[in-house]
């Protein structure tokens, strides 16, 4: 059974949840830990001879130590590159929190030191007309890792996301500052200082923008900027 399970969310879509997750997995592997990860639902998948494949889920598959089939890591694969609940409707698929919870519990029973479950978009992304993705970590009672893009407006988005997570009865286990774009925001250190003081959770690291780097090499390089001790110390 997975010793530590965390749900990874972001303040928005496109903030780098997958690269942060992969970097955490690489850091855990470097510490001698067995790792698992999954992205239960993914839109924007590509047609391949093996079926629908999502580049984020493939990155997670490459980063884990306990090798698993793709369909176990990404059981709900959707082709349209749009919001998951709309993509599911267009594909004629029913997506519910309980269905995703079932996939996650199936992963949790596998032996590992660390399991990361990556969400889609931000905390309140819809799964259907009645539920949001927040219902999944809520049902599983998972601590949450919050990915914050270091750009204008991120303080407000990070604080609101953390408030929503806690309002749902869950713990923000840590946060990671990420640079999803090359441009560095002005007064970045002031922003980091504010978040470190007011977000109420440990900063696990700040990941730089990597230029002219092979995508496959990024997680291992970025893992050096992380301190994942708060995630694996017990």
Swiss-Prot record:
Q: Which UniProt keywords apply?
A: ATP-binding, Biotin biosynthesis, Cytoplasm, Ligase, Magnesium, Metal-binding, Nucleotide-binding
Q: Which cofactor does it need?
A: Mg(2+)
Instruction: List the InterPro entries.
Output: DTB_synth_BioD (IPR004472), P-loop_NTPase (IPR027417)
- CC terms in the record's Gene Ontology section: cytosol
Cellular compartment(s): Cytoplasm
GO BP term, pick one: biotin biosynthetic process
Q: Which GO terms describe its molecular function?
A: ATP binding; dethiobiotin synthase activity; magnesium ion binding
Organism, by scientific name, is Marinobacter nauticus (strain ATCC 700491 / DSM 11845 / VT8)
Membrane spanning stretches: none
Ligand binding (Mg(2+)): 18, 56, 118
Its annotated pathway reads: Cofactor biosynthesis; biotin biosynthesis; biotin from 7,8-diaminononanoate: step 1/2
Q: What does this protein do?
A: Catalyzes a mechanistically unusual reaction, the ATP-dependent insertion of CO2 between the N7 and N8 nitrogen atoms of 7,8-diaminopelargonic acid (DAPA, also called 7,8-diammoniononanoate) to form a ureido ring.
Q: EC number(s)?
A: 6.3.3.3
Report the family membership: Belongs to the dethiobiotin synthetase family.
Q: What sort of enzyme, by top EC class, is this?
A: ligase
Q: Which reaction does it catalyse?
A: (7R,8S)-7,8-diammoniononanoate + CO2 + ATP = (4R,5S)-dethiobiotin + ADP + phosphate + 3 H(+)
Binding, ATP: 14-19, 56, 118-121, 178-179, 208-210
Pfam entry (one): AAA_26
Mind telling me what this protein is named? ATP-dependent dethiobiotin synthetase BioD
């Amino acid at each position: 059974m997975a010793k530590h399970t965390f749900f990874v969310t972001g303040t928005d879509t496109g903030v780098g949840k997958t690269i942060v997750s992969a970097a955490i997995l690489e850091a855990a592997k470097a510490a001698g830990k067995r790792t698992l990860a999954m992205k239960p639902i993914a839109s924007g998948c590509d047609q391949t001879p093996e079926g629908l494949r999502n580049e984020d889920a493939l990155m997670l598959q490459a980063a884990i130590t306990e090798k698993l089939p793709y369909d176990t890591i990404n059981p709900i694969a959707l082709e349209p590159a749009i919001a998951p609940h709309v993509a599911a409707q267009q594909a004629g698929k029913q997506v519910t929190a309980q269905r995703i919870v079932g996939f996650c519990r199936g992963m949790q029973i596998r032996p590992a030191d660390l399991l990361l479950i990556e969400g889609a978009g931000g905390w309140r992304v819809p799964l259907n007309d009645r539920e949001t993705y927040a219902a999944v970590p809520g049902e599983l009672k998972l601590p949450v890792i919050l990915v914050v893009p270091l750009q204008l407006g991120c303080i407000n988005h990070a604080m609101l996301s953390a408030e929503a997570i806690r309002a749902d009865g869950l713990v923000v286990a840590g946060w990671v500052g990420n640079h999803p774009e090359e441009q560095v925001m002005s007064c970045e250190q002031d922003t980091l200082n504010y978040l470190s003081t007011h977000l109420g959770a440990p900063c696990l690291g700040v990941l730089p923008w990597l230029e002219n780097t092979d995508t496959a090499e990024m997680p291992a390089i970025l893992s050096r900027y992380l301190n994942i001790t708060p995630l694996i110390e017990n």
